[in-house]
Structure formats: structure tokens, C-alpha cells
Amino acid sequence: MTKRRLAAGIGAFILLIVTAQGAGANTPDKPKPNGRVLIISLPEITWSDLTQRDAPTIRGILDQGAVGGLTTRTITRVTALTEGYLTVGAGTKAIGKGLKPILLTSKGAGLEVGEKFGTGTAADAYEQRTGQSARQPIVYLGIAAAIAAQQEETYDAKIGALGDALKRAGYNSAAIGNADRTTSKSSAPEYERSLVTALMDSHGQLGGGEVGSELIEVNAKAPFGLQINIDTAVSAFDDAWKPRSVVLVEGSDLARVDAYRNVVSPKQTLAITREALRRTDAMVKKMMTKVDLERDTVIVLSPSPPSTTVPLGVAGMAGPGIDAGLLRSATTRRDGFVQLVDIAPTVLTQLGIKVPETMNGKPFTVTQTDMDANARRDFLIDSDQASQFRDSMITPVAIVFIIMIALLVVGAII
């Protein structure tokens, strides 16, 4: 155990006590008519990544709003990207695999209905798998398997609950992103468009956005030789960002970076992560010119952790009536910490929509604190390091405990 990690753990514990004794949590102001919510998804990004000077726009949003460490664990200890998005959409811990696993060709297959899939189109495949017609422009081909997987688990998550609630209330939902690892011309496409599952309805259909191959462009220096086309993504956002709408925008280059990390050096991993963050921030900067934080809510989240570790993710919220401070929810009951299941109830609460009983998560509240933006970020980084150290010690301590018990038993027998 290093001195720095010990100090981080002690510091985080002291800060947690201090902030818990501060001002009580408060709920943001009542939503304004025709309000909108922008969800910025940063796959596999942690608070440590955001201390770099590569994301000034995203950091600016977080600095003026309330922030927290996001627990991304769902049913399994390590949450894959699909499980993270399914959980966001359900407001309850969800899983993307089970006794009836989602096929690899479908797990991330959120497709525009006219896209080629197999010998036909995505619309054809959707109807063949569900027996329903595709009535929305985007469909999730893994919907039947996803629903079946939940029935094998304790939580019995209602897939698409957030999308259903938004639709009932007359809100438009859209997703913009494409983290595919192959081009559309590949004979064996590797789809990674699971962002669709966060806002789709319970039928696996989504009313707007863009997730097709038009969103990616070739760059030989990027992971898998692909990167998001920023101008196309911004244009798609402009079309989707209308009154009474919820739009999820994914930093898809970040997801490709994480999938690529096993074949590059640690130094190069840092370099491509920083480049992906810079490009994501540039995209968000252009989109934010259309966002009014006096009326609109922006939520920033990391839907899944890096594939190599299980750190706390990033959570942040800015908008009407949201003071700078620390996020909290009735799920965690701790200042500065929220869970992935809290995202959906928060979106609905910000829009004045009743939260369905099927959702176990609770909406964010904000606890005011004397810490400035840098101190809040440092607190979350230190808390994350302390949490990872604690997790790393569980197995060794358990082994020592078992050995000691065994020795005591042997000693008693002798």
C-alpha cells in the first residue's frame, strides 16, 4: 500500500464526513415548459481522465453544475457498454447476457431501418425476430434476447422503461453515435451501437437520431482506422434538438479506444484516449451552442468502466436550478455518489414526468459544498482511488482469514 493511496483514502473519508455535515440536499427547480435533456455519454472515462486539459467544454459543464462518482456496476461486477445502456433505459440493474444470451451479432446492433443486415435490411431482421413492423427509424435487433435475459435475473428489469415513459408524455427521443469497429462494407460487421438501448421503447424502437455508417469516417491513425464524423454528428443533433426532446450523444471514439487498448502500449493508450477526448469535446462544443442551460438540462455520464479496471465513472448535471455541488440520490445516501440506475429517474424528474414503479433508481439531488470545482474533482478522484484499493484488498484479506481459521481448527484438533 503506497503512502499516496493511503493518504487518498484517508482524505476521501474525511472529506466525505465534512460534506455530509454541510448543507442539506436540495432538488432542482421545477422544469420549464418544453424543456429538453441532453445526455452526453463518455464510455470508459473516469474523473482522472478529465483532469487533463483535453476537454474544456465538458469540464466547463461539470464545473458549473453538480458532480459525483458514478457506480456503474449492474448485475455483474464489470459492466459492459450494452449492460450500462440497458440499465440506463430500465432505471433498474439490467444484464445483456443470461441463459438466453444476446448473440454477438445483435448485442450492439442498433440500426437504422434501411441499413443492410444479412440478406435484407434491419427492418426485415427486426420483423423476423419480433413479429412486429418497424414503425420508427431506428431498431435494436437484440431486443427479444435482451428481454429474455432479464427474466433469468432477480431484478427483472423492464427494458425500455425510460423510452416508454418519454413517449407517453409526448417527448421525442434520439440517439447519436456509432462505435462500430468495421466499416459498413465489411463482410463480418462488428456493431457497437448499444447507445440505442438507453432511450428505445420496450419494443426496441427509437424515434430519432443517427447511428448509421454515415456517422463514421476513415482515419488510419485512429483505433480500428475509424472515427466519428463530427460535422455529421452535429448536423444530426441540430435535427433532433427540438422542443420536448431527450437526446443522447455518445463520444463513440472513446468506446473504440477502450476496445483497442489490448493491442497498444500504456503510453499509446493515454495518447489515443486524449485524442478521442479532444475530438469528443470539439463535438460537444458545437452542440452546446444550441443548448440553453436556463431551460435545458445536460447530464454527463460514463455508462461503463474501462475494460481493465472497475473505477467510479463520471456523473454530472447542469441546468435550470442546479447549483454547483455534489450529486446525491436516495439510492446511495452519500454526498458525491450516485448510481447508473438513477439516470432514468433523474431525466424524468427534470421533465416533470412521473417515474414508473418498475424503476429502482432515484432522481439526483444536489448537496451544496464549500469545495470549488477543482476540490470537488480531487475529492472524487481520491474517493475512486480509495475504493479501488479497498476492492483490491478484499481477496487477499479473505484468503488470510480463511488460512487463520484453518490453522485454528487444526490447532484445536491437535
Each predicted region: which residue ranges?
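Soluble extramembrane regions of membrane proteins in the secretory/endomembrane system
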Residues: 24-392
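Hydrophobic membrane-targeting alpha-helices
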Residues: 18-23, 409-413
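Core alpha-helical transmembrane segments of integral membrane proteins
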Residues: 381-414
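Bacterial N-terminal signal peptides
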Residues: 9-18
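Bacterial N-terminal signal peptides that target proteins for export
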Residues: 1-10
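Short, low-complexity disordered leader/linker segments with a strong preference
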Residues: 6, 22-25
